[in-house]
């Protein structure tokens, strides 16, 4: 039981319905709904905005759902929100899902999954070009591996809308709230909420240690700004023609870092975790640095002999140095090793994202229409 400003409310407030003795809570429903909406948004973005094969994402969804739930639950124990030996690990319907852990685990598994699956030729993208061949203008179709940046830009920002929906589960569980205000202070500072969302306003009067105060609805603030960030990154940035691939991904980390840093520092003391604050700072810094690299540093490497040039020079040097210990190369001269390992010059005309994610597939598959 807990008490609001005017009356007492039973814990059943957070229960949507019962299945036998098992209570299905709004927290679990809203968290699942957030994941589903994010998945649908990612599929639509891949299919209609970027026009790349969405099948890899369909396959990843099964891994991603497990990753986000497992990661969020594990992170809850890491930051101290849940306690080992006290809190059941699989009682996720009762709360204790830390979204930062879900994001970290899901992106990590996504990097591994997409790195391998996008190397399959059936997922290559194709473009038709008019080229001169034997003094004739012919159409050729060029096939190449889709950059992981494309999938990242399409999928990762959709986490914001999932977070926005999932945060409402914290409202029904009476979690993620800020400092306490008296009824008079609440009306002065949050009177608009009583007009726009009277139910939310009423249920933010929470009794703690025998004292009933209005708790600042941090969940609502985060949900609101996540929706704004989602709209800006996914839709409004379409009008910024200078935005380069990878920018949306980094802006996700930047914006979610700012939002979470503000939210984490304003939480009630029982919901404030140092690890979450540090993680928010890392998201913010990582997004800022990553945005600079994707927009200004990486493009400067395009059409230049940099990444693979340096990599192969170092590789050739060390193989030549230790060739006597390598059966495959010990009978070759250093010049023969160089010719064998140095890639064709065509690799140097590829842009950075292609070089970075193409590994050893230097040559494009080409066929005539």
Swiss-Prot record:
Main localization of the protein described in the UniProt heading: membrane
Binding site for a 1,2-diacyl-sn-glycero-3-phospho-(1'-sn-glycerol): 167
EC number, UniProt record: 2.5.1.145
Keyword Nucleotide-binding: no
Gene Ontology annotations of biological process type: lipoprotein biosynthetic process
Any one GO molecular-function label of the UniProt entry: phosphatidylglycerol-prolipoprotein diacylglyceryl transferase activity
UniProt cross-references to InterPro entries, sorted A to Z: Lgt
Membrane topology category: Multi-pass membrane protein
Pathway: Protein modification; lipoprotein biosynthesis (diacylglyceryl transfer)
Alphabetic keyword roster: Cell membrane, Membrane, Transferase, Transmembrane, Transmembrane helix
Pfam families listed in its UniProt record: LGT
Cellular localisation: Cell membrane
TM region positions: 26-46, 60-80, 97-117, 216-236, 273-293
Top-level taxonomic group: Bacteria
GO annotation, cellular component aspect: plasma membrane
PROSITE patterns in the cross-refs: LGT (PS01311)
HAMAP family: Lgt
Family under the similarity heading: Belongs to the Lgt family.
Protein purpose: Catalyzes the transfer of the diacylglyceryl group from phosphatidylglycerol to the sulfhydryl group of the N-terminal cysteine of a prolipoprotein, the first step in the formation of mature lipoproteins.
Protein name from the UniProt record: Phosphatidylglycerol--prolipoprotein diacylglyceryl transferase
Lineage: Bacteria, Bacillati, Mycoplasmatota, Mycoplasmoidales, Mycoplasmoidaceae
């Amino acid at each position: 039981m807990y008490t609001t400003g005017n009356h007492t409310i039973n814990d059943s407030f957070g229960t949507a319905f019962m299945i036998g003795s098992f209570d299905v809570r709004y927290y679990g429903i809203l968290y699942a709904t957030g994941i589903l909406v994010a998945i649908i948004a990612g599929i639509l973005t891949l299919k209609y905005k970027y026009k790349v094969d969405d099948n890899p994402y369909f396959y990843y969804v099964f891994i991603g759902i497990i990753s986000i739930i497992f990661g969020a639950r594990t992170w809850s124990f890491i930051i101290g929100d849940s306690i080992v030996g006290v809190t059941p690990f699989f009682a996720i319907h009762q709360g204790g899902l830390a979204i930062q852990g879900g994001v970290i685990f899901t992106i990590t598994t996504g990097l591994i999954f997409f790195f391998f699956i996008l190397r399959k030729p059936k997922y290559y993208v194709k473009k038709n070009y008019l080229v001169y061949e034997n003094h004739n203008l012919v159409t050729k179709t060029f096939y190449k591996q889709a950059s992981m940046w494309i999938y990242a830009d399409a999928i990762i920002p959709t986490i914001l809308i999932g977070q926005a929906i999932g945060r409402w589960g914290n409202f029904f569980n009476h979690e993620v709230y800020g400092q306490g205000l008296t009824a008079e202070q609440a009306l002065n500072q949050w009177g608009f909420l009583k007009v726009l969302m009277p139910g939310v306003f009423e249920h933010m009067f929470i009794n703690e240690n025998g004292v009933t105060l209005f708790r600042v609805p941090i969940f609502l603030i985060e949900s609101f700004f996540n929706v704004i960030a989602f709209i800006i990154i996914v839709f409004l940035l379409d009008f910024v023609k200078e935005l380069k691939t990878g920018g949306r991904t980094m802006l996700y980390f930047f914006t979610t870092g700012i939002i979470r840093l503000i939210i984490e520092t304003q939480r009630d003391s029982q919901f404030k975790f140092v690890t979450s604050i540090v993680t928010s700072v890392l998201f913010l810094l990582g997004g800022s640095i990553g945005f600079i690299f994707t927009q200004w540093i990486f493009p400067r490497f395009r059409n230049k002999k940099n990444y693979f040039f340096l990599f192969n020079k170092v590789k050739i040097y060390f193989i030549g140095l230790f060739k006597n210990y390598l059966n495959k190369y010990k009978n070759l001269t250093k010049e023969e090793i160089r010719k064998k390992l140095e890639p064709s010059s065509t690799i140097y005309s590829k842009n950075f994202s292609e070089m970075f994610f193409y590994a050893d597939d230097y040559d494009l598959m080409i066929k005539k229409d």
